[in-house]
């Protein structure tokens, strides 16, 4: 009985840790949307901002990957 409660807690914790994946998707959408809005306003500046776009997407995705790894650790290592 006690082992079942511990397993349940691990799965609930892993599920809560994956909330960050939704945040990563929202973050990537904001970064790409703002880049597109700026590129449409000033097309000549878009190539210069491409590096900033990739850095912003990388930071947003890193948080999602981090929360996914925490969920995996909670499920299989704890």
Swiss-Prot record:
The keyword Membrane applies. It is a multi-pass membrane protein. One of its GO terms (molecular function) is lipid binding. SUPFAM superfamilies: F1F0 ATP synthase subunit C. Its main location: membrane. The chain crosses the membrane at residues 11-31, 53-73. Coiled coil: none annotated. One of its GO terms (cellular component) is proton-transporting two-sector ATPase complex, proton-transporting domain. It comes from the Bacteria. The record marks 61 as: Reversibly protonated during proton transport. It is found in: Cell inner membrane. Keywords: ATP synthesis, Cell inner membrane, Cell membrane, CF(0), Hydrogen ion transport, Ion transport, Lipid-binding, Membrane, Transmembrane, Transmembrane helix, Transport. F(1)F(0) ATP synthase produces ATP from ADP in the presence of a proton or sodium gradient. F-type ATPases consist of two structural domains, F(1) containing the extramembraneous catalytic core and F(0) containing the membrane proton channel, linked together by a central stalk and a peripheral stalk. During catalysis, ATP synthesis in the catalytic domain of F(1) is coupled via a rotary mechanism of the central stalk subunits to proton translocation. Belongs to the ATPase C chain family. F-type ATPases have 2 components, F(1) - the catalytic core - and F(0) - the membrane proton channel. F(1) has five subunits: alpha(3), beta(3), gamma(1), delta(1), epsilon(1). F(0) has four main subunits: a(1), b(1), b'(1) and c(10-14). The alpha and beta chains form an alternating ring which encloses part of the gamma chain. F(1) is attached to F(0) by a central stalk formed by the gamma and epsilon chains, while a peripheral stalk is formed by the delta, b and b' chains. This is ATP synthase subunit c. It comes from Cereibacter sphaeroides (strain ATCC 17023 / DSM 158 / JCM 6121 / CCUG 31486 / LMG 2827 / NBRC 12203 / NCIMB 8253 / ATH 2.4.1.) (Rhodobacter sphaeroides). The lineage of its organism: Bacteria, Pseudomonadati, Pseudomonadota, Alphaproteobacteria, Rhodobacterales. The gene is atpE.
């Amino acid at each position: 009985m006690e082992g079942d409660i511990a397993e349940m807690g691990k799965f609930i914790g892993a599920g809560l840790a994956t909330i960050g994946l939704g945040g990563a998707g929202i973050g990537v959408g904001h970064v790409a949307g703002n880049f597109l809005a700026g590129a449409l306003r000033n097309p000549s500046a878009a190539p210069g901002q491409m590096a900033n776009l990739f850095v912003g997407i990388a930071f947003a995705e890193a948080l999602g990957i981090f929360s996914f790894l925490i969920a995996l650790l909670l499920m299989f290592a704890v």
